[in-house]
Amino acid sequence: MKDKFRAITLAVILCCPFGLDPAWSWGQTGRPSQILRSQRTSQRLSTQNPASLHAQGPRMLTTTSLEILWVQCPAEATGLDPAVACGYLPVPMHREQPERTEKIRIYFEVYPHINQGPAESAMLFNDGGPGLSTTSLRAPVLALFGQNLDVHDFLLIDDRGRGRSSAINCPDLQHATTPFKKAEAACAAQLGSSDSWYGTGDIAMDTDAVRAALGYEKVDYWGGSYGGEDVTAYAIRFGEHLRSIILDAPMGTPGLRPFLLDGDNARATAREVRLGCKRSPTCAADHSEPDFEFAQLIQSIRSKPVQGWAYTASGIPVDVKLNEGALLYLSSFPTTSSSVPTFFVSTGEILAAGESLLHGDSVPLLRLGAEVTPFVTDYGDPTAYSQGDYVATLCVDFHEPWEWSDPITKRQEQLASAISELPSDFFALFSRTAGANLGVSFEKQCLWWQKPTPSNPVTRSNPRYPSVPTLVMSGDMDTLVATEEVRQVAALFPESTFVKVAEAGHVTVVWSQCVVNLQSNFFETLQVGDTTCTKTPETVSAAIGRFPFVAADARAAEIDSGGGNEIGIAERKVVTVAIATAVDALKRSTIGNGNGVGLRSGTFQSSVDMNGNQTTTLTNCVFATDVTTNGSLVWGADRSFVADLTISGSATSGGNLHVEGSWEAPGSVGKFKVSGMLGGRRVAVLVPEA
C-alpha cells in the first residue's frame, strides 16, 4: 500500500500510506529521499546487485508486437544491465468507452535472463503505492531477486498515471501548496472525465497487453502492499498466464470495503508496540504491561493533546500539535530507518515517551510528532511518486460509504453517519474520532474526488481466483496492511501458503535475508520450503526503556566482571545516559539527512565513506539534562559500533569513554562493552545494545 512513509526513498533502493519512503521502503509513499541513507543503502545493495549482468548492449526480444515503440533506456537502467530493453506500448485510455480513441503509452523495461535459451517466464513486480513508479525500483528488484535472472526475464511496468507512463502531476496536491481538500478537488477537475480511468482493473489489462506484445506466455507476479491489488486484478482476469504469485503484505479485495483496513491497522498498533518492546531488553525491563501503558498514553492525549516546538530528525524546528488522531497516524506509520529497515524509531520510543509525559516531560513525545512525515507534504518529483495518481487509483478502487453523484456536503454527512455506526471499539485502542483522521482514513482521503463514470473494478462479481502456487507473507509488526487483512487475502487464492515473519514491518522482503531467500527460491522451485527462519527475529530493533530527565533516573550500567570496574552506581547511570545519547544521534541520522540536534540540546553531523561506514560526530549533545556528551562514533557497514566519547555535566566527575559492540546487527541482542575513566576511576561496564 501507499506506505506513506517509505516510498520515494525506496525508489532509491527498493521502497509510501501503502508501500512510503523510497530509500528502503517498498509499499510506502512519500518521504523525500535523503543522501546519507541512500549512500548506506546503495552500499548495502551493491554487495548483491548483479550490475553489468550482460556485457552486450540491449537485447531485443524476438517475438514482439509492431505496436511497441522502442526507446533508449535511461542511464539508471543501463548502468544496472547494459542488455536492458525499454519501450512504450500504446493502449486505450478509456476501454469502457470504445467511441473514445485516446491512447496512453505504458512504459516498461525488460531485463533479459542470463542463461542460453528462451526465458522460462517473465517476472512482474509491483509495489503499489498507489502512485509509485515501478521502474524506479529497478535497483532493489535486481538486488533482491537477481539470482532469478538465470532463466527468468524481469519485466518492470509503470502503471498508467505513474513513472514514465504519463505520471499524473497535480501541482497543488503533489507539493502541498494548498489545503488537501482544495488540492484534491483541483486535481479531479484537472483530469476531468479521465478521473475514473486510473483504477487497478484498467491497470491489469494494460499489464496483460504488454505481456502479450512482448510474447510471454507465462509470468510470475510479485505484488507488495497495494501491489496486491494489481496482482488480484490480473489473476482473476488472466490467471491462465500465471506461473506463480508472491504477495508480500498485500492489499486485496477485503480491504477495499469501507473501514475494514482502517480498523485492522489501528488495532494492530498495540501489537506492534508490544512486540517491539518485549523483544528489546532495554524496553522490556521498564515496561511489563505495554498494552496498558499504550492505552494510558492514548487516553491521556485524547483528554489533553500535547503542543509545542520540536525538531525533526534533520534538525528543523516545527510546531507540533499531537492529538489522538495524530498519535494514531504516528503509530500506524512508524518512523522507520531506510538504511536499516529492521528498525522502528517512533514506536520503539512511544512507551518511554508516554512515561516521560506522565512525569511532566513532553520533549520526547513532541519530538516523535515532529519526526513523522505528514500525510499532506511535498512529495517531490511526480515521476517517482505521484500523489495525484494515489487518489486517482485509490478512490475508484475503494468502495466508499457515499454516492459519487452526491455533493460534498452530503458525502460528509454520509461518512460521519457511517463512522458513528461502527462499534465503539472498532479502532481500539483508539476512538472513532481518531479513526476519522485524514492521514489514516482512506475514505476521508477521497471525499473531494470525483468519479464521473463507473470504473473498471479490481474484481467483478463472483471472481474466480486461479489455482497457481502462491506464497503470501506478512510481518507481525505491520500496521500498514495488518496481518488480519493479509490472511483474508491469502484465503482467496486456492493454492496459497501463508507465512508470518517475526519482527518484520511492512513488506517483509526488505526486513530479512531469510525472506529474500524464501521468495527467490519460491520463484525458482514453486515450493515454499523450510520457513523456520521466519519465526525468530533476524534483528531485534532497539526500543527505549526510558528517557531520564536527569542521570539519577537512568538504569545503572552492568559491571563487567572481568574489567576491573571502579565506578559506582551514580557514574554507571551516567554511562548509560552517554551511550543512549550516542545511539539517539545515530537513530536520528538514519531517518533524517544525517545532521540534527540532540534530544534536549547539542548537535550531530554524519558522513558515510565509500565503504558504507558512517561516522557521526556529537557536539554538546544532551539526553539527560545533567550529562553532556561530545565525541564521535563509527557505525560500520558490518553493523559494528565503535565510539569515543567525552563526558561532562553536573551529574558526573567527567572523563572519557570507549565503546565497542554492534548496533542493529543480525542475531541475538548483545551488549556494548564500555571502558575508560570517569573522575579518575576505571570504567568497565556493559550496556544492552537494544
Where in this protein do the model-derived segments appear?
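Short beta-strand/loop motif that positions the catalytic acidic residue
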Residues: 466, 472-474
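Glycine-rich nucleophile elbow surrounding the catalytic serine of serine-hydrolase chemistry
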Residues: 133, 223-235
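Catalytic-loop region of hydrolases
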Residues: 24-177, 291-300, 451-455, 516-517, ...
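Conserved alpha/beta-hydrolase "acid-adjacent" motif
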Residues: 479-484
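Alpha/beta-hydrolase fold active-site neighborhood
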Residues: 296-465, 528, 547-630, 634-644, ...
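Conserved acidic catalytic loop of the alpha/beta-hydrolase fold
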Residues: 204-218
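A catalytic-pocket lid/entrance helix-loop region that shapes and gates access to the active site
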Residues: 175, 233-297, 329-332, 338, ...
